[in-house]
Amino acid sequence: MANGGWVKDDRKLKGEELQAYLEEYTKKHFLKKKVRDTRIKMRGAYIYIFATVFNDHQTRETGKEVWDEMEIARLGWIGGDEYVLAYFRHTGKWQDCLSGTLDKCLQAVKDNEFGLFWNF
């Protein structure tokens, strides 16, 4: 809702279709040696990307393999096919770092364009 009126939702993908697309994309492009799984959570205009990652430190400490779920990225829908990409800071807050199309934002996460997303 902007300026007290309704805003037309003209996203190309939305709802379950968008979630299925993102889950398929993240599993295809983000799974690596230290990333076992990914999960998408949608809430309002935000899409959160989580990853289950290998915890080297805890594994050495306990002698058992330890995997933790981490916040990787947040996509905030602006309008049309425009999103704002944010990373999760060590302070526990989200920080915006890029705006662009859904594909551009996902590519930035995949390539770790700013060195902000895959820090574990």
Residue ranges: model-predicted function:
Residues 36, 43-47, 71, 81-83, ...:
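Generic structural motif recognizing short loop/turn segments at the entrances and edges of beta-strands
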Residues 8, 65, 92-95:
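Short, charged/polar micro-motifs that form catalytic or ligand-binding hotspots
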Residues 5-6, 45, 64, 80, ...:
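Intrinsically disordered, low-complexity regions
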Residues 50-84:
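Short, conserved beta-strand/beta-arch hydrophobic-aromatic motifs that form part
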Residues 77-120:
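Short, compact, well-ordered microdomains
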Residues 1-61:
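Negatively charged, low-complexity tracts enriched in Asp/Glu with abundant Ser/Thr
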